Regions:
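Extracytoplasmic "Venus flytrap"
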Residues: 32-49, 70-74
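Short, polar/charged alpha-helical segment
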Residues: 41-66, 126-127
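Contiguous mixed-secondary-structure segments that line small-molecule binding/active-site clefts
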Residues: 52-53, 89, 94-150
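Alpha-to-beta junction loops
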Residues: 60-63, 79-93
Length: 150
């Protein structure tokens, strides 16, 4: 009996997963957005859901976004490689994950490096901050913006 309950649960999850994936129509460009947070309480998850709704409303027939929260598709350690392989098109990993490409991103992990969140914003919008973000382009990743992670 326990096996049947487990099998039924697995089937329900598989059907649910297929239903989510079927939201995009044939011919639409599919944009997969993978992140590690929940969708109802964390600002990153809420923003990802709102972006998904906007893309799907405004790009109807041209592009379709599917958001995969809670590491359901990739975790922060895997997502950059998945992007380089074309398996996912958008992600919002912790900035520390970019250290595998360049050590300059360690700057954001140094304690007390910035006086407050406004100082972080000022640095990220500065010429130096923008150069850091753009440094990922030659590695095959395009940074759209910095996103606070805590």
């Amino acid at each position: 009996m326990k096996f049947l309950a487990t099998a039924a649960t697995a089937l329900a999850l598989a059907v649910t997963a297929n239903t989510v994936a079927a939201a995009c129509d044939d011919g639409e460009i599919v944009i997969k957005f993978s992140h590690v947070t929940n969708t109802d309480k964390h600002p990153k998850g809420i923003a990802a859901t709102l972006l998904e709704q906007r893309v799907n409303d405004e790009m109807n027939g041209k592009a379709c976004m599917e958001v995969f929260p809670n590491s359901t598709l990739y975790n922060d350690n895997q997502v950059l490689e998945a992007m380089l392989q074309g398996d996912v098109q958008m992600a919002a990993p912790s900035l520390s994950k970019f250290e595998q490409f360049t050590k300059t991103f360690r700057l954001f992990d140094l304690p007390f490096m910035f006086k407050n969140i406004n100082a972080v914003d000022e640095f990220q919008t500065s010429e130096t901050g923008q150069a850091m973000k753009e440094s990922m382009t030659r590695r095959g990743l395009i940074g759209l913006a910095f996103w606070h992670n805590g």
